[in-house]
Amino acid sequence: MKKVVGFGDYILRLNPEGYLKFIQADKFNVFYTGAEANVCTSLSYMGVPTEFVTRLPENAIAECALSTLYKYRVGTHHIARGGERIGIFYVEKGASQRPSKVVYDRKYSSFSASLPEHYDWNGIFADAEWFHFTGITPALGDKLPGICLEACRAAKERGIKISCDLNYRKNLWSRKEAKQTMEELLPYVDVLIANEEDAADVLDIHASNTDITSGKLNREGYIEVAKKISDKYGIGAVAITLRGSISASENDWSALLYVGGEAHFSKQYRIHLVDRVGGGDSFGAGLIYSMINGFNAQTTVEFAAAASCLKQTIELDVNLSKPADVFALMGGDGSGRVQR
């Protein structure tokens, strides 16, 4: 099996213990994360060869970050070194009616100062079959939109499948900037992952009769959105995650995969959330796993949705679920009974 390549930032996650608010915290738990890294790590845990490409400084904190990738057998051979710092991501976990909060401190990170010469795409893609990036990556630095475009062109020349998660972050760039950049990248993309907010914010495409704050989700509206995206940008497969928010602790979760002019919905899961950060990344990993293994469209969306459901019951950003765990949930085993 050839490898899946992910390209993006790798940052330090700090969060208070349990459900403490920032103002209550006198210590923080440490983890290392990044959207594309989470996808690679989840896939590696499922047995898929992966390579994560980023840029990290030459210091002890970066070495700790690398050790996390080593632990899960994620390839690091093409990580560039240099720059001053690793970005930081603070997470305050919400509960019930209190939402989670996130604070970023990632300006001037090594990755944000990336230059085209830091990445040899010929070498990176030498034994790859899939390339994954998100809309976070081009938002992080002046040169990164061009670097992403160069990577997409190199992948496309080699017949490598390309997936992208829109992942719009309003504190990184404006809607106008995001739309302008992503519309240049999307023609290269084979599989696009989004949610209803991303589609509206970045592409100005909206789901009819849907209120994400009330948990009201209209299936026909999402099919309309997926079709518009597919038709406008020539994208073969569009996946949309559907989150109905009951509270910060309880969500309904399902997904739509639109491919070949047909819509396929997964079953819906009611999740008591443990940690929703990384839920979209685990969905992306499940989607990629399914597609490289040749699953049909319905099985693909069921697997991706179930994988992501399991992730949101796991602390921190990475889905540490094996394919057998996912298939068990798909088969109806969601009781949570002790396995002996």
Features from the language model and the residues they span:
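Positively charged, low-complexity intrinsically disordered leader regions
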Residues: 1-21
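Active-site nucleophile and cofactor-binding loops and adjacent substrate-binding regions
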Residues: 27-37, 54-57, 79-83, 275-279
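Conserved N-terminal subdomain of the carbohydrate kinase-like
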Residues: 49-136, 326-340
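Catalytic-core regions built around general acid/base machinery
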Residues: 146-159, 181-188
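A short helix->loop->beta-strand "cap" motif at the edges of active sites that frequently abuts
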Residues: 156-161, 233-236
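Conserved phosphate/ATP/ADP-binding segment of small-molecule kinases
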Residues: 172-260
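Conserved post-catalytic alpha-helical subdomain immediately downstream of the catalytic base
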Residues: 264-333
